[in-house]
Amino acid sequence: MQNKGIVICVAVLLTLASIFYLSFSFATRYYDSKAAELKDPIAQQNYKDSVKYLGVYSYQNCLETQIGLGLDLKGGMNVILEISVPDVLENLADHKTDAGFTNAMREARAQEEANGGDFVSLFINAYHKSAPGHKLAEVFATQQLQGKVSPQSSDAEVEKAIRASVQDAIDNSFNVVRTRIDKFGVVQPNIQKLEGQQGRIMVEMPGISQPERMRKMLQGSANLEFWETYNSDEIAPYLQQLDTRIANGDNGEEKTDTVATDSAAAKKAVAKAEPKKAEGKFSIKKKDDAAAKVGEDAQNAAAIKAHPLLARLQLAGGLSTVGYASVRDTAAINKIIYSAVAKRVLPSDLRLLWSAKPADHLNVKNIYELHALKVTTTTGRAPLEGDVITDAKDEFDQMGSPVVSMKMNTEGARKWAQMTKANVGKAIAIVLDGVVYSAPRVNGEIDGGSSQISGNFTIEDTKDLANTLKSGRMPAPARIVQEEVVGPTLGAQSIQMGIISFVVAFVLLMVYMVVMYNIVPGMMANLALLVNVFFTLGILTSFQAALTLPGLAGMVLSLGTAVDANVLIYERIKEELRSGKGMKQAVAAGYGNAFSAIFDSNLTSLITGVILLVTGTGPIRGFATTWIIGIIVSFFTAVFLTRLVYDYKLNHDKWMHCKFDTAVSHNLMQGKKYKFMSMYKITFTVAIIAAVVFISSFFVRGLSKSIDFTGGRNYVVQFESPVEPEEIRTVLGDAFVNADGTKANTSAIAIGTDGKTIRVSTNYMIESNNPAVDDQAETILYNSLKKAGLVSQENVDAFKNPDVRQGGSIISSTKVGPSVAKDITMGAIYSVLFALIAIFLYILLRFRNVAFSLGSTIALAFDALTVVGFYSLLWGLVPFSLEIDQTFIGAILTVVGYSINDKVVVFDRIRENLKLHPKGDRQQLFNASINETLARTINTSTSTLIVLLCIFILGGDSIRSFSFAMILGVVFGTLSSIFIASPLAYLVLGRKIKAEPAEEVAAVEAK
């Protein structure tokens, strides 16, 4: 063996690096156990702060460098944030209102929603259609793009500036998100921009137990504004007239009547509507009080018909609060106050915004305040914004209530002093992300740049708000378009299941190798497997990649790849020994002859793994990462490390009489002369019939598509007692109703075998961008199940807590927005096509004949069709989920990777025999090549199936569908190598070769 020194050097470096990185995991566990011995939490933290691993690394360094666990193993939250590119463009255009720009934005949004695509390109095309003859510079020669775009700039220059600014906004948003998460204290977060998906950021936060806080923190743009306000008595008459005009059926067309604005009418209107109170304090103590009637009036059809606005909105007097309303009425009120009628009736400089929290001085729950803000700038923006804030702290006021104190820079302090001086006796509204957090009365000029946000806050609220303000403002709004929440208890169960399946699969593989190849070769292969796992974990830790349940599956599957390499080598050695060679020569020839098959099969699998890594997200990337590492490591350990050991032993005259078989495997598939090629008509007919059945099933039964492809929400609910999915479907059938009055699609399927775990799927208001819809959906689910007596939790918060299992709870949840679902669908199609094309080209490059490329690609397509076809035929008939989701697409690509591995081995033997017998009978040559590799095919398939069956039976529900697809892929991929790929290659290759003898004769005669 050549280059032994390089192999030894690489092995030593990998060993040292793996030991170094894995040691941090042991150090962390050691320090945790020592700290746990201390009873005082402060003492525990002081101990952790004082330790230094290896004299250099702090406890925090150890925590960040140890093996990271993914969400499915540790619990936590995974979200994909989408930065609003349309909002970035509107900011760059200074919120232009001309028809050309607004129409182009509307058209681009519609096209993006319908078909996806690059929004900047969609907008530019739409603008050229809506404003023909006009240049982009007319819109974007603004203060925002000063120095980049001038009125004379060409469209190409403007587009370049826009794209650069959009990318800057995304980069800045990424940095803001990272800063917020760091301040939140998440351990080992994974934050990355998704390549090829403009404006999307993936955030993985293991260990998060408060998803509501994270949603609020991640989606908050920190757009802080200070607004002057109207007094409520100035606005009440306008609201009354708006109420009257809506009741009379006004559709917003021009009217001749005017708004009564005299002071007497205003006072009369307020007096009529205003409850008795002092300085905005609205006390509700009696049943007949005005605010208590808010809910009753809203339910009274006659009152709503007579007063569409004021039956829902209770007018108030004093300062900026113009009224109170129940949270359930806010949507209807918004529809009125933002209507075309309202634009004609209400003052043009009026903005109406809701309070961020329910009014804390009322004795009725979920009553919100509506505030009247006054626009005083020509641009329509707030006179003072959050970019002047230099610091924000969570503190307590004189009454002991949590507040957020802020400091401003010099310019901000100057404007703040002017603003407060001009509004003494009035309120100034402090607005964050479009809602009013507080609107305090100004008692006098405030200099020094100090301000405070107060309200109905908890300590956590003020801490998060201060962190959000300190992290900086998001350049554009961000919304969660995909989300997954996994409870820590479920994660612990996944760890247990994953470890059990891994250990059992590993032990069975070791036993199988010894049974098939005897003690010494079997244990050598097993040693290579152990080293494989050690190196894989070490490399994974050095990359700071999180280990997930699919990642564990990828590691287990890579063990199958490692076994395949050893099987190829050992079968070759057995052939050489049977030909009469000595042990040294047989081992050298075995490793040499098996190299090309191992190299090609591993490289084709690697191509598939890279495509998975590039196109996949979340669990698929975790699987692809460990699988790729496992493929590379298994190639190194099987081909080079084991060869070093054999060479060392044989050079010292050890293992000279080593046996590579046992009584079980001695004559396995030896001397067989199956005539596979003569059966191709039968096998092709069977394959065509199967394909017709599968395709027919697609039209008749379809596929069970998950929310990954349809968009929606999944809630995995664990009940105290067994329940039937049909009962859940009945209970929830009418519960989820969209804003337009249509029923949302809702389904329920059983998870596991105990009957206590049900997954509820719904597309309830999935198109809405309102973050509050997430909470609404969970509340509807809780109320419906509670009313039916299926859960007994006291409140929705306990129901949403995955650690509170008694009484029933949501143990995990997933959300996929419609735009993400479309991208996932297209990504799935492209990834499978790219894999097939890449493999076709590689086989063509390596085998230099299109016959092998065609045979392998068509067979791979049939393998994929077979797996998908069985999912179509069997969903709803087997006791586990067969939904088509991202993990399933990963399984399809993995099937392609495994199947091509098998086909390459067969084709490699055919290629070898073609070189040895160029004039031989092609049919006999193909048959002989397949027969010669049958032992390897059976051993590899069996060992891989052992691994997959362990994952399928012991790996848990989340990975069962994946392993089932892989089992189908291994079985039918092996069969297609023999009965589809090889006959196809034979037919194409055979026809080409038949013409060669005549050509050769002609060439000879010409000479």
Mark where each language-model region is.
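Interfacial helix-loop-helix hairpins and adjacent transmembrane helices
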Residues: M1-I67, E90-H128, A156, F640-F694, ...
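Hydrophobic alpha-helical transmembrane segments of membrane transport and translocation systems
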Residues: V531, G538-I539, E575-S596, D600-A687, ...
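Non-transmembrane, solvent-exposed regions of membrane trafficking/translocation machinery
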Residues: L22-Y31, D49, T65-M77, L81-D433, ...
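Juxtamembrane "pre-transmembrane" interface segments
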Residues: E204, G448-Q452, E460-V507, I780, ...
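Small-residue-enriched core segments of transmembrane alpha-helices in multipass membrane transport
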Residues: V12-T15, G522-Q544, M555-A562, F623-A638, ...
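Cytosolic juxtamembrane regions of multi-pass inner-membrane proteins
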Residues: G560-T604, D647-W655, S872, V878-T940, ...
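Pore- and gate-forming transmembrane helices of large, multi-pass membrane proteins
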Residues: V177, T489-L509, T561, K581-T617, ...
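Interfacial segments of transmembrane alpha-helices in multi-pass membrane proteins
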Residues: Q2-K4, V404-S405, N409-V424, I428-A429, ...
